[in-house]
């Protein structure tokens, strides 16, 4: 919905597609600063937490992608910020509910985490009376009523097919089904071991200290910051589909925990040196990855470059409402990029060469996309069967040899590129 709004304001473009992701990413940094400053009344912790959040590059990279993980992380952070603020001013519970609803509307059931974190925080801190606070109950009703309104509307419009596709395929099959990945409870731990440096050891030590303060010393703020990443991490680890960007919602908490851990360890001189060093690293890294050929997660390089190179000729040759064949590519990638840049949809993949040949025989005019290596292998085995329309280092766009005379290369009446 927000992407559609950006399209309406700025026109359809890559900038419009990622506009709100970038805006929400900036909002997360601001919220992290405000939350840390509210909890500890110390600008050093707040500023350090904001800088720590920027690295590793997975956060900045995700903030530049048209995906819902950053909006979800923003609403989770906003909801828990409001929950903490409600300790002294109860009307903040209403914003807690509205932000949770935004999380549910952003990424379905994953948006419920603020409710779960708040519930366990109240239980472990024995705030029984607070659990029935009228404003908190109202906030929860707002979260569930507004958040799940989309489910009701979708069910009323699409019926059982919505239930089957959303809950059956998207959630249960992808998350827990037999055909995704072998079950590995440590999958997210492995992702953090690969991607969360240099902060991982400090965050782990900090989590231990925060857990001790929360459960033994009965410090409410420490308990909440401990439950936030721990609960999300444990629940997400029960699924089979482990992708670190799904856990971006815990990055603000880990950044604050790491910053507070440094604050407790360092004297004033070391603190100033750390901040100066972090700020310098931010500037030098940004300069290095964007002014040199070196490629990294945070590099401001052209996204989906290989798809963009083929998008115009795909659109020229494939009529509207006709799908592009998919030989041995994945189900999702590059499906969305093809749809965005060429206005053409990619079929579900087929894996067997025999099936490809059968479909080409039945429909010689059908056009296909495959990995370039796969196409070269096909071409070497059956050089007379296929005609290569265009290829690059990653993808090959091809058809049958019988269709070569019908391939179009005249772009004179077509807008290029289709999407900037």
Protein language model regions, located:
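Transmembrane-lumen/periplasm boundary regions of multi-pass, lipid-linked membrane glycan transferases
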Residues: 9, 86, 98, 102, ...
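Short acidic/glycine- and proline-prone juxtamembrane loop motifs at membrane-interface regions
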Residues: 18-21, 61-71
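Transmembrane-helix motifs of polytopic, lipid-linked glycan transferases
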Residues: 19-40, 78
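Specific aromatic-rich, kink-prone transmembrane helix
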Residues: 31, 71-88, 99, 254-257
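Transmembrane-helix signature of polytopic, membrane-embedded enzymes
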Residues: 32-55
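Membrane-interface transmembrane helices that cradle and orient dolichyl/undecaprenyl
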Residues: 38-39, 43, 79-93, 262
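Signature aromatic-anchored transmembrane alpha helix within multi-pass, membrane-resident enzymes
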Residues: 262-292
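Short periplasmic/luminal acceptor-recognition loop of GT-C membrane glycosyltransferases, typified by
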Residues: 287-402
């Amino acid at each position: 919905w927000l992407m559609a709004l950006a399209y309406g304001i700025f026109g359809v473009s890559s900038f419009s597609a990622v506009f709100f992701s970038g805006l929400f990413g900036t909002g997360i940094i601001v919220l992290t600063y405000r939350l840390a400053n509210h909890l500890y009344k110390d600008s050093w912790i707040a500023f350090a937490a904001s800088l720590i959040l920027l690295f590793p590059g997975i956060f900045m990279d995700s903030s530049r992608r048209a995906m819902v993980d950053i909006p979800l992380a923003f609403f989770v952070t906003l909801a828990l910020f409001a929950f903490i603020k409600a300790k002294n001013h109860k009307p903040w519970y209403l914003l807690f509910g509205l932000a949770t609803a935004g999380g549910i509307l952003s990424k379905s059931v994953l948006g419920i985490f603020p409710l779960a974190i708040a519930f366990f925080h109240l239980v472990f801190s024995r705030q029984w009376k607070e659990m029935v606070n009228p404003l908190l109950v109202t906030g929860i009703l707002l979260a569930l009523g507004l958040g799940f309104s989309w489910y009701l509307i979708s069910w009323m419009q699409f019926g059982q097919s919505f239930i089957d596709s959303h809950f059956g395929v998207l959630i249960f099959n992808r998350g827990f089904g037999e055909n995704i990945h072998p079950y590995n409870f440590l999958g997210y731990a492995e992702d953090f071991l690969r991607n969360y440096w240099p902060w991982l050891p400090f965050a782990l030590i900090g989590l231990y200290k925060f857990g001790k303060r929360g459960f033994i010393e009965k410090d409410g703020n420490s308990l909440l910051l401990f439950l936030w990443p721990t609960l999300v991490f444990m629940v997400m680890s029960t699924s089979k589909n482990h992708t670190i960007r799904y856990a971006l919602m815990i990055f603000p908490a880990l950044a604050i925990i790491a910053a507070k851990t440094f604050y407790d360890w360092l004297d004033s001189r070391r603190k100033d040196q750390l901040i100066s060093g972090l700020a310098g690293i931010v500037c030098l890294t940004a300069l290095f990855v964007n002014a040199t050929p070196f490629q990294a997660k945070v590099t401001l390089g052209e996204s989906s470059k290989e798809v963009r190179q083929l998008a115009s000729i795909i659109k020229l040759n494939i009529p509207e409402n006709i799908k592009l064949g998919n030989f041995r590519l994945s189900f999702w990638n590059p499906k969305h990029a093809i749809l965005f840049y060429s206005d053409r949809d990619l079929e579900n993949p087929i894996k067997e060469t025999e099936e490809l040949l059968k479909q080409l025989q039945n429909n010689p005019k059908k056009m296909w996309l495959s990995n370039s290596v796969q196409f070269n292998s096909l071409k070497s085995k059956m050089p007379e069967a296929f005609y290569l329309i265009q290829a690059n280092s990653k993808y090959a766009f091809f058809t049958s040899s019988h269709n070569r005379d019908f391939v179009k290369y005249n772009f004179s009446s077509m807008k290029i590129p289709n999407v900037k």
